[in-house]
Amino acid sequence: MNHSLYLVAGLGKTGLSIARYLKRNNKSFVVFDTRKEAPGLAEFQNEFPDVPIYLQQTPDEVISQVTDVITSPGLALDTPVLERARQAGASIYGDIECLAREISAPVIAITGTNGKSTVTTLVGEMAKAAGFRVAVAGNIGTPVLDMLDDEHHYDLWVLELSSFQLDLTYSLSPVVATILNVTPDHLDRHHTMEAYTQAKQRIYRGAKAVLFNREDVYTVPHQSCQTDIKCISFGKDAPSMGNWGLIEQENTTYLAKGMERLLPVESILIKGVHNWMNALAACALAEAAGISMQHILNVLKTFPGLPHRCQWVREVDGVGWINDSKGTNIGATISAINGIGGSMQGKIVLIAGGQGKGADFQELAQPVSEFVRSIVLIGEDADKIESALAKVVPVVRASSLEGAVTIAKTCAKPGDVVLLSPACASLDMFRDFNHRGDVFTSSVRGL
């Protein structure tokens, strides 16, 4: 007889998928959410009318019976209900851990502060081109447990994993794992760079091969590579044998593996040095998982990039407009400024601002001084950004993103690019970064 009682912590998309997974496996469960009006509550009650739901508080007599807590990654590990369950002896883990315990197909695991979604999508496309039945999931698209129904159809999983998901995962043994880069983000949750890096490093546990960024010390495996683990690196410099990088020859830059030139960067559609790094990482991961170089390079030549990630909108009166609304932290915005600024003659007019998540905006000073003409600020933390950068370049304030577009048009000169890369989260003014990007794109199309 099964006496286990599961607590699903957190509703929303992930919580719903966990509940469906438990129901398919005939497990008894209850649900908790910290919010009085939890997202997806009506949908949940419609689908699971007999399952008890506790909002904001869970009684001690329930906690004392719980054997396992499967929590959504959005719930901080020090949430009181999780602390009480831990003290009562319950195991606490997330949906990725459930997946790891269920599947036998190989996994490519991808994390990093920036570029995760681009690399994950690219690797998925490479696998599809090579004929793999591939599941692309995790911190992108469909929750993993909603895809488990079809597990026998997949011969490869490509997972984008956030630091929050990795905090809750113990058994994943990827065929290859990578940390693309680590820059300050989510410090409101992890508190220190050390804790944030430690969460990212969990992706390497049990991996058969690891791919790291040789220009970012935080991505280098903390456990030195053992003899049975293959270590591969990528970077902007010329690579050593078996590694990935860029080679300059006769005024042309090539993606390369060792001394082998694979493709001139002009042949790929995703632009900017940061996207060349994403392309190299995707190549390395795909090859490590057994995908042929022919399929890898064919996809690279046709992949258009993802919406809201350094996405070209249009040119107006000689000025280019680029939507990088996914630039929700300083590292992403630095990558965008350096990547775009380093490949053009003019200057950048930067639109930035929103919720800064405790970041230090002084880190923007160097790339801003080199490539940016002026900054138009919006949002909650505009004061903090202005105090960090007002001595570097002219700073103007706008009360809305539509207003910022109008101001940026007057600041830019022919040959310039207006770049929306906020270095901040969007929730002070928008539903999410997609909404912010859509508002920007719509405003630019209306110029």
Curated annotation (Swiss-Prot):
It holds the Pfam family Mur_ligase_M. Pathway: Cell wall biogenesis; peptidoglycan biosynthesis. ATP binds at G112, T113, N114, G115, K116, S117, T118. InterPro entries: Mur-like_cat_sf, Mur_ligase_C, Mur_ligase_C_dom_sf, Mur_ligase_cen, MurD. It comes from the Bacteria. Signal peptide: none annotated. Its EC number is 6.3.2.9. GO terms for cellular component: cytoplasm. GO terms for biological process: cell division; cell wall organization; peptidoglycan biosynthetic process; regulation of cell shape. It is found in: Cytoplasm. Keywords: ATP-binding, Cell cycle, Cell division, Cell shape, Cell wall biogenesis/degradation, Cytoplasm, Ligase, Nucleotide-binding, Peptidoglycan synthesis. It catalyses: UDP-N-acetyl-alpha-D-muramoyl-L-alanine + D-glutamate + ATP = UDP-N-acetyl-alpha-D-muramoyl-L-alanyl-D-glutamate + ADP + phosphate + H(+). One of its GO terms (molecular function) is UDP-N-acetylmuramoylalanine-D-glutamate ligase activity. Its main location: cytoplasm. Coiled coil: none annotated. Cell wall formation. Catalyzes the addition of glutamate to the nucleotide precursor UDP-N-acetylmuramoyl-L-alanine (UMA). HAMAP family: MurD (MF_00639). Belongs to the MurCDEF family. This is UDP-N-acetylmuramoylalanine--D-glutamate ligase. It comes from Legionella pneumophila (strain Paris). The lineage of its organism: Bacteria, Pseudomonadati, Pseudomonadota, Gammaproteobacteria, Legionellales. The gene is murD.
